[in-house]
């Protein structure tokens, strides 16, 4: 049997709409992500389990893990009879790369089970394609960090889909999911079709400056440049309490605060444990809306998707 864990991820990381993503894992060892296991069988089957299993489609063929199996078999040119099991531990529509977790774990598990017939770039291309079926367009800012780990910049040139950007090991990423759902398609539909020239210039400056600051090891500058002029001004209305949380993050001393993916999860970057604990406590008390919500203090997950056991 093969079992793969795929971690949560932050799409956009504020400053890089659709082109930047970061994998994260809680510092307490909690597995914040999905697992998919594959074992030999006479015919294909898919079993669903996990905390958020009730949120999955009732029709098995609408399950993205079934579609991963189907597309993988198509790619290698033969049908592989297996029993698959999805542990759905990630809330759907959370802004934590939930669908990417299932896609990455499903495709990587199949590839490992079949002795890796597909290379990493081919597999990542399939991951983007499958994730695009859910979000409505192909973008790699969740699947790339989820699969490869770390902070990833999407390049999509010269046969390269993404490459890792050096980040800061002492940064703590406080992740808060309020327990409500925001669909990626809805969050994309709210964005304008065109942007002002000044916003385009600002976006280019922030993104280029952030990447430069990461490579030249300037954490304060990097954090200051983590600003979103593309999505956050429009998506804030979908996120109850976000404006208050951002204000609290500044007062508590977080380096940066933003929307994870299309929300409703937010992240706050802190450079010491005490600040992260204060931020987590505030979010636990003020940002969570029901008992499905949670707060985790995380670090970048540099390993990405990996075999368990």
From Swiss-Prot:
Q: Name one GO biological process term.
A: threonine biosynthetic process
Instruction: Identify the pathway.
Output: Amino-acid biosynthesis; L-threonine biosynthesis; L-threonine from L-aspartate: step 4/5
Q: What is catalysed by this protein?
A: L-homoserine + ATP = O-phospho-L-homoserine + ADP + H(+)
**Transmembrane feature ranges:** none
Where primarily located? cytoplasm
Keywords from the named record: Amino-acid biosynthesis, ATP-binding, Cytoplasm, Kinase, Nucleotide-binding, Threonine biosynthesis, Transferase
Has keyword DNA-binding? Answer: no
The reply on keyword rRNA-binding is no
Gene Ontology MF terms: ATP binding; homoserine kinase activity
Enzyme class, UniProt record, top EC level: transferase
One cellular component term (GO) for this entry is: cytoplasm
Entry EC no(s): 2.7.1.39
Pfam entry (one)? GHMP_kinases_N
Instruction: Kindly give the InterPro entries that the UniProt entry links to this protein.
Output: GHMP_kinase_C_dom, GHMP_kinase_C_sf, GHMP_kinase_N_dom, GHMP_knse_ATP-bd_CS, Homoserine_kinase, Ribosomal_Su5_D2-typ_SF, Ribsml_uS5_D2-typ_fold_subgr
Q: Please list the residues that bind ATP.
A: 91-101
Any idea where this protein resides? Cytoplasm
> Which family, according to the similarity comment?
Belongs to the GHMP kinase family. Homoserine kinase subfamily.
Q: What does this protein do?
A: Catalyzes the ATP-dependent phosphorylation of L-homoserine to L-homoserine phosphate.
**Name of the protein in question:** Homoserine kinase
* Gene, per the UniProt record: thrB
